[in-house]
């Protein structure tokens, strides 16, 4: 992606204003599976809060004050923003208020989004099956599905998606997100993968899902000369929100991509379609929660500018010819009017000589020889 476009896009999202967040009741401990590579806000309503963490993968450690991790930021109101989280950052996150009392505790499993298994129900594609793991006793590996997200379009056919996380359950115990359960145990399985499932939808429009934000226009994207493609990034788009792209007002769908019908664009599964790879110039629009948030116009190429200049020059020449023709017609018309006025003036003078004005008597002289 061109540096300037990347910069604009990444400054646009904070300006527009919010990240997807999860919350936990004050004083409680909450367990949650999420996806790596997708920004998340861990809510803690305590101004001046301090955060402590313990990553559970790798060697044992202890709670450490969160001060210098590059992709984490404590927000003014106390919440913790984690940008592009890594699978290795799976672990415990504690929020303490400025008086040294724990406010909330999160146990987060950042499951590896690069191994995402994506399926479309309308194409007959099947999600991952359950599997048995043997670690001293039998553990069941299964997918825990989140509710379906809202349809990404309304009043016309759209698509909706849902996320699935791999959980492990053993007899008489509650199920846990797999990597929180495994901790330091190194296990490989082709079924220890998060899932994304898509299906068609058709709903009426409501105001309940709208973001109510102004949209942004970017009008200078170019395809890379070497790779011949560019990545577009939809502000406010997220794996956790419904996203929809259109190319010249034609919807881009997961169904077309997963069935191999569309090779001009590529919706990135690891971002839930927030990022779009394009291989040809067009006007691209992205919608989040059914609302337009950004429009991308291609920068004009040198050939296009030259063609436009030639077209404008030809139009100017034609306009000048037409103007010159109209000017000649007007001049001829003026000459004709002037001739008519002159003739009428002469006729008027002649009539005055032939018929004197009433009330004035003429002197007549009779000559007799």
From Swiss-Prot:
Q: Which GO terms describe its cellular component?
A: membrane
Q: Where is the signal peptide?
A: 1-17
- Cell compartment(s), UniProt: Membrane
Q: What is this protein called?
A: Protein FAM187B
TM stretches of this protein: 336-356
The parts of the chain that form a coiled coil are none
SUPFAM superfamilies to which the protein is assigned, alphabetical: Immunoglobulin
Please classify the protein's predominant subcellular localization into one broad category: membrane
Instruction: Provide the membrane-side ranges marked Extracellular in the record.
Output: 18-335
Q: Which residues are glycosylated?
A: 45, 68, 130
Membrane recorded as keyword: yes
| Record family assignment | Belongs to the FAM187 family.
InterPro entries per record: FAM187A/B, Ig-like_dom_sf, Ig-like_fold
Annotated organism of origin: Homo sapiens (Human)
Q: How does the record classify its membrane topology?
A: Single-pass type I membrane protein
Record's keyword terms, sorted = Glycoprotein, Membrane, Signal, Transmembrane, Transmembrane helix
Q: Which residues lie toward the Cytoplasmic compartment?
A: 357-369
